[in-house]
Amino acid sequence: VHLTGEEKAAVTGLWSKVNVDEVGGEALGRLLVVYPWTQRFFDSFGDLSSPDAVMGNPKVKAHGKKVLNSFSEGLKNLDNLKGTFAKLSELHCDKLHVDPENFKLLGNVLVCVLAHHFGKEFTPQVQAAYQKVVAGVANALAHKYH
């Protein structure tokens, strides 16, 4: 992903304030609630029967944290997202058979959650930079599908 110096500063500046546990669980939970067909990849997570069940599910929260920790690694390697996410791309493609469109959906949900958490601080410029990043990460995760 090519970001200007200003965009990189905006992304890393905001990310340094992100509570990965909280935001990760909320982002994955919202994905599962807003796009319920994505739940089929999480059969082992137990009760996903209602929005409250999803948002309170400890396995959703734990996996959301894991997802955002990987995203954090991506932010440290913006110039090599394909390399950073190669193993995860392979896992999600070959073993889990996740629809690569879901990576885009999760990226967009993450942007919504960041906007919700940071309010006025999440300016249109910050959003534009994050949209570039989540699109780059989604492309890197979809790489093994091509």
Swiss-Prot record:
Pfam families hit by this protein: Globin
Entry-annotated residues carrying N-acetylvaline: V1
Record domain Globin: where: 2-146
InterPro entries attached to this UniProt entry: Globin (IPR000971), Globin-like_sf (IPR009050), Globin/Proto (IPR012292), Hemoglobin_b (IPR002337), Hemoglobin_oxygen_transport (IPR050056)
Gene Ontology BP annotations: hydrogen peroxide catabolic process
Binding site for heme b: H63, H92
Residues bearing PTM S-nitrosocysteine: C93
Tissue spec. comment: Red blood cells.
Keywords on record: Acetylation, Heme, Iron, Metal-binding, Oxygen transport, Phosphoprotein, S-nitrosylation, Transport
Record function comment: Involved in oxygen transport from the lung to the various peripheral tissues.
Family listed: Belongs to the globin family.
Subunit structure: Heterotetramer of two alpha chains and two beta chains.
Name listed for the protein in its UniProt record: Hemoglobin subunit beta
